[in-house]
Amino acid sequence: VIFLTPTFLGDRLPGWWGKIFPAGGIRLGLDLRGGVYLLLSVKAEKAVEHELANIKESVKEELNRDKVLLKGFENHDKALTLNFFSKSDLEKAKKLDSNYKDIADIDENNLSLSFTLKDRYITEVQTRAIDQVKETIRNRVDEFGVVEPTIQRAGADRILIQVPGASASDRERIINIIKRAALLEFKIVKDAAPNQELLLAKYGVKSPDELTAQGLSLHSGDTGQENEKFFITENEAKVTGQYLSDARLVFDEYGRPAVGFSFRGEGATRFGELTGENVGNRLAIVLDETIKSAPVIQERISSQGRITGNFTTDEAKDLALVLRSGALPVPVDVEQEQTVGPSLGKDSIEKGRLSMIVGGIAVVIFMIIFYKLQGVVANIALAL
């Protein structure tokens, strides 16, 4: 009885109770308290693409440093192929073997060098990405202030999330916080137009994919400007959200909610270089592939800035939260999503309480009838 009392009375217990008896109740699950249930599928294969992209950038830097002329790159599933103009350049590039032999099989073919990621390393990369998704989601849920969430792996590439006790008003916010990729990038704007067809025609291409060969990217815009629904930016983001030291709710000069951000050491240096080299140009603030704002750079900025948009106060708070927690390293799909009401749990608790009372009374009566005086003594001892 003493151990069960905190479960039924909770905050109604007197202050002295915890000093004498256990004050922690039984943790009630989703079926009893209601809340949020999500089953996420992690696109772990994207982690392999990201790893190949990182290898590509590293190789490019090493070859440029050694003044090796490179014709181009080709991506094939889990392989990266380097094409050279001459045999001498290929021979110079072979020294890369020692840097990547532990993670990739390296093959030579005419004027090409191919790096094929080893299966063992692919598994390691994917596992690391799934674990990082799990920890990022845990950080987001914990920072939201939810008590006792359950976040765990479910099979090879799935994550199960249960948030018991979430109020009806918080459930939608929690789901959005969990699902959001929160990939923040800063890119220089090259052009803008009310529709993408105008931009594609202007740059002589038929699809956004063809812009990549020109070092450009097409993004939709959510800036509130009707004549700027689509933007073309530089493909490479020299600064991303990984360099943020803080993100917080602020208000702009018109009193509208916004998100203020600050950079740490290397991020401040990178952001300062990006803005300093592009004074007079527009800087796109890209969130999950959508441009939220694109202000003109008036002067060099190094340490902090602001993301504006059509945010409510809660939306700005939630965006700041996910930016502080970090972006998901790979996309996730929601396979199952349920919000469970507490009514079923309330009925179960009431039935459990009633059955415990009825059962307890039945035991007391049985012991008195069967054991007489000894039964009375035993009942008193149990009560104490």
Predicted stretch roles:
Residues A44-V296:
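Non-transmembrane, solvent-exposed regions of membrane trafficking/translocation machinery
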Residues V1, L38, I137, G165, ...:
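Residue-level signature of catalytic and energy-coupling elements of molecular machines
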Residues G260, R264-V279, L283-A284, E350-L384:
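Interfacial segments of transmembrane alpha-helices in multi-pass membrane proteins
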Residues V42-E45, E49, R120, T312, ...:
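Short, exposed interaction patches on small structured surface elements
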Residues I26, G34-A44, G155-D157:
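Membrane-interface junction motifs in transport/secretion proteins
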Residues G18, P22, G29, G165, ...:
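Alpha-helical membrane-interface segments at transmembrane helix boundaries
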Residues L287, I301-Q336:
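Extended, hydrophilic extramembrane loops/domains of integral membrane proteins
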Residues V1-Y37, E62, G215:
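Hydrophobic alpha-helical transmembrane signal-anchor segments
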